[in-house]
Amino acid sequence: LWINYKDGIYRIKESAMEVQEPTFISSALQLPGVSIQVICRKENEIWIGSAQGLFRYNMDTELMKHYMYDPNDNNSLSQNFITDIAETGEHTMLVATLKGINLYNALTDNFERINKDTGEGEIVQNTLNCDFVNCLLTDGDIIWVGTEVGGLNKMSRRMLLVQNYYHIP
């Protein structure tokens, strides 16, 4: 079990039947002043979503990489406030933000953005109906996206097809 505790990321052994002090992992995981929102483990990496961007820590090399929004780079994160992180059945990392979803490309070490607006005021069909993404859930080849005001979006990873579900009062 990975937790945010005292400005860092620690591990608690689940086998212990009592509350215990978290195990210190690495000084690289000390993140003072960083508002951590979500932690996700993928193989030998820990992905940390925060209000200050995304951190990816490699447990073998003990190296930390910090990803942030860059207005001059369309392959950077779409926004720095990370609301959720999930892994698809194809082992692709998805990063939810207040401005859409970001698909991590391990080959290029950058992101593909999925959001409502192209940036030119044009609304794209078959995409998110709200950029403010609260949560992600992956179920095989399906990605469920919970949004702030757009309701639930159902994405198919293979075709990046999005279906929108929302309440009409």
Model-derived regions, located:
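Carboxylate-rich, polar loop motifs that coordinate divalent cations or form catalytic acidic clusters
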Residues: L1-P169
